[in-house]
Amino acid sequence: MSNLMYNKMWHQTQEALNSLLDKEFQKMSEPQANKVLVFQMLATFYINYVQIFRNMENVYDQIVHPQKRMLIRKVLDGVMGRILELKNEMVELEMTEFHYFDDILQDLKLSPQQLDVPIPRYFLKERLEVIKGREKILARILTECGLNLPVKYAAKSIALEEAVKLIQIAERARQGRLRALFMKQIFLQECRAKEMKLLGHRLLDTKLAALQIQKVWRGFHQCKKTVKEREEEMVFLGMKPSPLFNEVSDAIVQSKQVTNLRDEVQLKHEQDYQEALVNIKEDLKMLEGPDIKEHLQDQIRQWFIECRNLTGTFPDYPNEEDGGSALIFSNKTPEQVMGDIIATQEEEEKLKKKKKKEDKENKGKKGKKEKKEKKEKKVSLKEKAMKDEDEEWKMSPSLFLQLMEEGNSLYKDIWLNKDESWNFPQDYDPELIKEEKRKELEMEIRVQVDELMRQELKNLKLAVNREMEIPPRQKKGKKEQTIVFPREVFGNPRVALVSLHIRALWGISYLSFNNGTIESLYQELVEKGLLIQALKVNLSDYIGEYSYLGTTLRQVAIEPMPSLLDVRQLITLYGILPLGSAEVHERAPLVKSLLLAGPSGVGKKMLVHAICTETGANLFNLSALNIAGKYPGKTGLQMMIHLVFKVARQLQPSVVWIQDTEKTFYKKVPQAEKRFEPKRLKRYLPKLLKLLKPDDRILIVGTTHRPFDAELQPFCRVYQKIILVPRPDYASRYGKFHEVLWKEIILRNGGKLTNSLNISCLSKVTDGFTQGQIVQVIKDVLTERRLRQQAHKPLTAIEFITMMTNMNPVYREEEESFKNWYAKTPLGKKRVLSLTVGNKEKEKDKGKKGKRGKKKK
């Protein structure tokens, strides 16, 4: 698309955002008590914001104007954060992580695919050089250590007699095949000789021969034509995809080329813009700097004279902390400025007196308050739930609405009615840069002018009033205790503070950590196997389909199992979006830890690697088996955690992965695993979570296939969000035209889909099998030899089904055990409680209606 088209798309998206903000501000002022209506309102806002986010992300990725992109980025981060806030509101309202919008999508006339939250492409594009450089360093360290060498499979040693027998069997089989082929050829020759003897006395008629050839040819031609017509009819009726469905069209190839060209233009315009910022500021400093300085001095001198004429004395010059001479030019009279300065001084004195009185009063009241708070906390969960039902619901304050409103107002002021007919290539606008840099230059010059005018005011007071300025008294305070460490210990002051905090929490009395640069620490972690290379897996490779019966099942009081697409959405919302954007991570509801629980083979490990791939994050492996034998002892463990989180903070975003995390929280450690000390991290994980702040883009991700083996309370205390990853449902295994499991994986491994391969039968038969098992079966069937045979021997369903017989599916009992375990988690308990309260209220309403009916009779 052209620049004009993307500009038009941006204007339409801004209009939609403007109307949505108006609606949201209106709804926020109207408290509601009905939870169903509240959820529908939140879900509608959520879906509308997702549509705006999809369009805005596309515009930001393709638009080439550097100044427009800055504004779009601001709005984009605001929309992204607002989506996370609305998701958090829906979770607190429904007490579940999974929501279904079937009815709302139908009302808005949207398809389920339009509900998919995209991953912004700028997460990787703007950090591409950093990510590539880090990958090169990691690859170099791995090659030096010999950790990335291909796995050499050792040959199985067998006895000499067995080897001779194997060779003899193979040789005899080869000779047998040759003998059988030779005998077959002799038999065919004899058959041909017999036919020739029988037909030898008859002369062949040329007309009969021609008719015979025509008959065979016409039959073959008509059969081929019928097959072609049948395929065309199936495509027309929508019962079969078009033959061009899996082929990449020329239009798509051309659009990719245009996209790459736009990326180059975008980069060039950004470089020109950065150069223009420096050049234009220098030009303004040379041309307008002296005039601005002279104008400011004249204004301040005029203020001196006006204040002396009104009050009889020269005024006190405002301090730099209060804004300096900026206070003078805030459209106020000299009397108002003097009044403000005096008022602030009086307020400071009053606050000091109040604090002293409050400190004395609070000492006696502390004990009484603590007793009252303990009594108030002893309210049962059921009473709280009933109170929440009766109270009116109000939306919690948003930190992103103001950001979006600022971006929207800037768009209206600058870009809405701006004439850009002169700017066809969409380069930077120099006038906007001049306005911005003129303000910066004025602030810089004002600081210099303030120093000069303060001295001038002193001289005036000495000359006219004979006054000596009394220097302000320095406030006496407690001396801060400073601890000096060697520079090599903590290069970054922020990391030093964090390290000191860790030492205080864990009671470390001395420094035993490996001191050095981040590069050396990075290399040490790689060599120890704690920092690993993430696999190149995109989140879109986690194939799944939308759950079309979610709302219907919940209306009948049946809790549906989430679909794979629902899991993918949660990974995007809780893992990828906050890690990818620092602005969103600082303001959005903070998610420090994430747990993926589900049977073996459902793709938990793949999702962890997808988070790292989509955000360019480092991957640290602190699994119980991986850290076994490394950094032994208590001090060694503290040193390891310190190193991991120091590097993770410096090179954020980072993901700390704990595979088989139930081992860290075992109820009872198995005898075979006691030597690995799997519970080493159990004590330290809650403390680490407390140290993570909003500006630390670090996510702790745990994966488990046996969560019921762990102690529930400490397990749920560490993991803030728990996502249940299910086995694929029928919609995910089979679909008509969407990317679904069987079709997509067969095509990826070189297979061809034909009429002889019944995908529907495969999807039905493989109910209960996981994605990992399906992938393994397809790889086992589609060998190199089988791929070469596809031209004359198409794939059939029976080939895959026979391979499936050797595998065990996820049985209903195992799935129910995961559901029962999830119902014991904090969010699961709240969900069960809210459902029971809702059912009781429905029964009460039915009873009231029945009594009314009897009275009428």
From Swiss-Prot:
Q: What is this protein called?
A: Dynein regulatory complex protein 11
Keyword Hydrolase annotated? no
Give a GO cellular-component term. Answer: motile cilium
Q: What GO MF terms are annotated?
A: ATP binding; ATP hydrolysis activity
Provide the taxonomic classification: Eukaryota, Metazoa, Chordata, Craniata, Vertebrata
Q: Which portions of this protein are annotated as coiled-coil regions?
A: none
SUPFAM superfamilies for this protein: P-loop containing nucleoside triphosphate hydrolases (SSF52540)
Q: Which residue ranges have biased composition labelled Basic and acidic residues?
A: 376-387
Q: What does this protein do?
A: Component of the nexin-dynein regulatory complex (N-DRC), a key regulator of ciliary/flagellar motility which maintains the alignment and integrity of the distal axoneme and regulates microtubule sliding in motile axonemes.
Q: Which Gene3D superfamilies match?
A: 1.10.8.60, P-loop containing nucleotide triphosphate hydrolases
Assembly and binders: Component of the nexin-dynein regulatory complex (N-DRC).
Q: Which UniProt keywords apply?
A: ATP-binding, Cell projection, Cilium, Cytoplasm, Cytoskeleton, Flagellum, Nucleotide-binding
Location of region: Disordered:
348-388, 834-857
UniProt record similarity statement: Belongs to the AAA ATPase family. DRC11 subfamily.
- Which part of the chain is the IQ domain? 206-235
The source's superkingdom equals Eukaryota
Q: Which InterPro entries match?
A: AAA+_ATPase, ATPase_AAA_core, N-DRC_Component, P-loop_NTPase
Give the binding site residues for ATP: 598-605
- Which SMART domains does the UniProt entry name for this protein? AAA (SM00382)
Does the record carry Cytoplasm as a key word?
yes
Query: Which residues lie in Basic residues bias regions?
Result: 365-375, 847-857
List localization entries.
Cytoplasm, Cytoskeleton, Flagellum axoneme
Classify the main location. Answer: cytoplasm
